[in-house]
Structures are given as C-alpha cells and as structure tokens.
Amino acid sequence: MADKRDYYEVLGVDKNASDAELKKAYRNLAKKYHPDVNPGDTTAEAKFKEVNEAYEILSDSQKRSRYDQFGHAGTDPNGFGGAGGFSTDFDFGGIGDIFETFFGGSGFGGRSKTRRGPQKGADIKYSTEISFEEAAFGVEREINVSKMEVCSKCTGSGAKPGSNVTTCNHCNGTGQVQIKQNTPFGQFINTKTCDACKGEGKIITEPCPACNGKGRLRSTKKIKIDIPAGIDDGQTISLRGGGDPGVKGGPNGDLYVNIRVKPHPLFTRQGNNVVCEVPITFTQAALGAELEVPTLDGKVKYTVPEGTQTGSVFRLKGKGIPYLRGNGRGDQYVKVNIEVPKKLNDKQKALLREFAEISGDDSHEQRKGFFDKMKDAFK
C-alpha cells in the first residue's frame, strides 16, 4: 500500500473535485496513456492501469468515501475496508467512452444501441394566413398539407403484394451484427447495425413498385382546422397525430400550424384591446359631435364632448378581441386626431379672423399656460 500514489494525485485533481471534473481528467489521461496510442511503451501501460484504478475508486461514491477515510487500506478487499477494492473489471460507464474513441461503435455490449423499435412519425410545420376579423372571432380553415402516408398497395410493409419477405441471414433477424476485436485488455465485442438489412432484420426480395419498398408515399392531404377566437399573430395550433405516420407501429407525428394575421387598414391590436384612430374637424372638436366609429361588430355612434383635444382617447368597453381562453372581450380605444383644413375660402378666413379677435387666450388654456411659463423662464 505504501508504494501506491494518492488517487487524486494520479488524476491531477483536487480532493473536492466533482464527478464531472473526475471524469474529464480521467478521459484526458486515459487517451494520453492508452496502449494503442503508445504501442510497446511499458511505462505508458503502467500509467494507464494506474489511471483506471484511481478512477474506478473515485468514481464510485461509496468507494471514494472509504478511500477518503482510510486511504488505500479502505479499498483493499483483504483489509477492514471490506469488498469493493480495485479489480481488473473496468467501470463500463467511464472506459466505454474511451473505447468508443479508439474502436468506434460501442466496445461493451451493455452500452450498444438496440435494434430500432417503434418510432414516432416526423412532426410537420405549416403556416397559414388569416384576416384580422378571423383572428378575432375564429374560423374553420381547410389547409393542404404535404405529408407521408402509409402505402395502400403494400400496407406499409414495403414488399410487393404476394412476394416473400425473408429473415436476414447476416443478423438472424436481430438487425445487429457483432464484431470481435482483440485488445491488450482482452476481447471486446462491438455491436453495430446490420448493413445487409439496415437494422430491419428482414430482407425484401421484391420491393413494392408503388413506394419503391419504403412502405410510405408522400401525398397532399386536406385537413380542417378550427382556429379559435382571440388567436394572435405568431401563435401556433397543434394537432396531435396530424404529422407523418409512425414507423413499426409507432405513433403519428404532430402537425403544428403557425398563424399569421394580416394587418387591418383601421385597427391595430394591443393584447386583447383594439386601437382605432378617427379624424375629426376642428369645429367638431370645439363644439362636440356625434361620430360614426368603426368596430369589429360594425359601426357604432359615439359623441365626443366639446373641447376635445387632438390625441384624446375614448374607450368603447367590450368592443375588443375575445379572450383566447376565457369569457369576455377586451376594449376598443378610439384615438381622436383633429384635422386642420389646408385650404380655406375668403369667407372662412374672415370668420376665423373674427373668431381669433374675440376669443383671446382665455379660451385656449394650454396656449395661455405655455406662454405664462415661457415668460417666467426668461425673466
């Protein structure tokens, strides 16, 4: 025991090193000293064994705890540490990754990929455009989706109807073959997908002419979707099972429909509220007026009070967008913009001049306040 180096020193890590730090150090050293990288180098081989021994202990929480308490004696199967010391068996969870690097595939059977079983079909993404009103109140839409369908001729088998499907004699129907490799540490078995049957375990002697042996065909299918009221631009509707069919009995993929909403010439959307800008004349603003205001439900009458200022906003309760998941609707906000005429006839100009002479500043509170502040600022 006295000749053994400290395991943490062997791996070049601190005693408080995390599992990830241990694994990283181990991988780097194992690659550095691996016998296949250093053929005939007995020093490198000894280092490699030392690194594996250190990692075998420190990667196991119970063994590491005994080592931290009792040192090498705690890992000696003949000492008071009990069973669990170093043996020639490697920790497959760690060294298996190293052998993948040098030999490819999976050197240990327990980590090999199994033959492919049922697989979910591919998901399909689709985009459709709807109007502002359709987004507000919902709509049923029929879309044409390009998707894979099970071949009706061979019912998905890929074989010509009436032909024979034989078991692959390369893998005996397992879909996998094993390759034995001799290494300085013994014989390792690498499991890989059978090239002859591509992992299917069967050989189709006469492929289906309709689908070229694939068992599926691409086609365009009409699908009806219900777009709910209140949906917003950029939101997605999912239809479970609306995607491509599964493989080997697996479930169908899903269909995801992205909704794009066309801009409206009058309305803009803010959450579940609708904003509309309405132009009025300066006489309507000054005297007040009954206006026809467009809403999603049609035109409604609304009276703006006298003295309305440009930029004033009025609320029409419950005239907005329906809530997507719940009752009720948002509101509509009407923003008033006062339009000043660009052309006036002589009579109109004369009347306005007369109005200006008799109005004074008392009827223009904002203007009067502004000039009062300006006088104070430049005293």
UniProtKB/Swiss-Prot annotation:
Question: Could you give a GO molecular-function term held by this entry?
Answer: unfolded protein binding
- Sites binding Zn(2+) 1 sit at C151, C154, C208, C211
Q: Name one GO cellular component term.
A: cytoplasm
Q: Where does Zn(2+) 2 bind?
A: C168, C171, C194, C197
Repeats (CXXCXGXG motif): which ranges?
Answer: 151-158, 168-175, 194-201, 208-215
Q: Which Gene3D superfamilies match?
A: DnaJ domain (1.10.287.110), Heat shock protein DnaJ, cysteine-rich domain (2.10.230.10), Urease metallochaperone UreE, N-terminal domain (2.60.260.20)
Keyword annotations from UniProtKB, A to Z: Chaperone, Cytoplasm, DNA replication, Metal-binding, Repeat, Stress response, Zinc, Zinc-finger
UniProt xrefs under InterPro entries: DnaJ (IPR012724), DnaJ_C (IPR002939), DnaJ_domain (IPR001623), DnaJ_domain_CS (IPR018253), HSP40/DnaJ_pept-bd (IPR008971), HSP_DnaJ_Cys-rich_dom (IPR001305), HSP_DnaJ_Cys-rich_dom_sf (IPR036410), J_dom_sf (IPR036869)
SUPFAM superfamilies in alphabetical order: Chaperone J-domain, DnaJ/Hsp40 cysteine-rich domain, HSP40/DnaJ peptide-binding domain
Q: Where is the J domain?
A: 6-71
Which stretches of the protein fold into CR-type zinc fingers, per the record?
A: 138-220
Q: Record's family?
A: Belongs to the DnaJ family.
Please explain the role this protein plays, according to its UniProt record. Participates actively in the response to hyperosmotic and heat shock by preventing the aggregation of stress-denatured proteins and by disaggregating proteins, also in an autonomous, DnaK-independent fashion. Unfolded proteins bind initially to DnaJ; upon interaction with the DnaJ-bound protein, DnaK hydrolyzes its bound ATP, resulting in the formation of a stable complex. GrpE releases ADP from DnaK; ATP binding to DnaK triggers the release of the substrate protein, thus completing the reaction cycle.
For this entry, the protein name equals Chaperone protein DnaJ
Q: Which gene encodes it?
A: dnaJ
